[in-house]
Design a protein with these regions (language model features):
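Rossmann-like NAD(P) dinucleotide-binding subdomain of oxidoreductase/dehydrogenase enzymes
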Residues: 101-205
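N-terminal Rossmann-like NAD(P)+-binding subdomain of aldehyde/semialdehyde dehydrogenases
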Residues: 1-108
């Protein structure tokens, strides 16, 4: 019998290390790179529209295809169009006022920059919307993402895990389902930013 090395990094830790190294190698992706990522995400949604609806229905026990399209799929597609339209402006430096009495002749600028690796904890309700819409703005901002799905979204998580690697490399995006206490470990990872949708009580755990 071979014993596992307790000091060996977990799959989550390895994923974070991979993405952080990729971020440090290319910390400020170009406008063209970000647009390409957004179009790739939109292509994934369009090419798997029916599969996304089927996965949601399986996870819910039953859910109207029209509800999923109207509440989740179409808003995600439209959100990407919105980001593509405004991305160039979002990336431009923004001027800020200066206290001219103390800093006469000085100028201020805020330069938008990626933060690095962003974690996303997705709830069971509206999980397509609450995973793909955050990814839209994570990629628009030039970041990388690790996504943890709900234990009640097994079919959707499996769809993501099976299909998304054909669209994004692991150093850009990885998705995890809720197995073996993944949620607790995921929430404790030292992300550069963490997005969580849920109750305040759960968020404090």
């Amino acid at each position: 019998m071979t014993l596992a090395d307790p000091s060996a990094p977990s799959a989550l830790e390895s994923a974070l290390a991979l993405q952080r190294a990729a971020y440090l190698a290319d910390p400020v992706p170009s406008l063209a790179r970000r647009r390409a990522d957004l179009r790739t995400l939109q292509r994934f949604i369009r090419e798997h529209k029916q599969a996304l609806c089927d996965a949601i229905s399986a996870d819910y026990g039953h859910r109207s295809r029209h509800e999923t399209l109207l509440a989740e799929i179409f808003p995600a597609i439209d959100g990407i169009d919105h980001a593509l339209k405004h991305l160039r402006g979002w990336m431009k430096p923004q001027r800020r006022a200066v206290d001219w009495r103390n800093f006469f002749g000085a100028t201020n600028r805020v330069i938008p920059q990626p933060v690095g690796v962003v974690g996303v904890i997705v709830p069971w309700n509206f999980p397509v919307n609450l995973s793909l819409v955050p990814l839209t703005y994570i990629f628009a901002a030039g970041n990388r993402a690790m996504v943890k799905m709900s234990e009640n979204s097994r079919h959707l998580a499996r769809l993501y895990i099976d299909k998304l690697p054909a669209y994004f490399p692991p150093e850009k995006l990885q998705v995890f389902d809720e197995t073996g206490g993944v949620g607790v470990e995921f929430s404790r990872l030292p992300f550069d930013h963490l997005l969580f949708t849920g109750s305040g009580a759960t968020g404090r755990l």
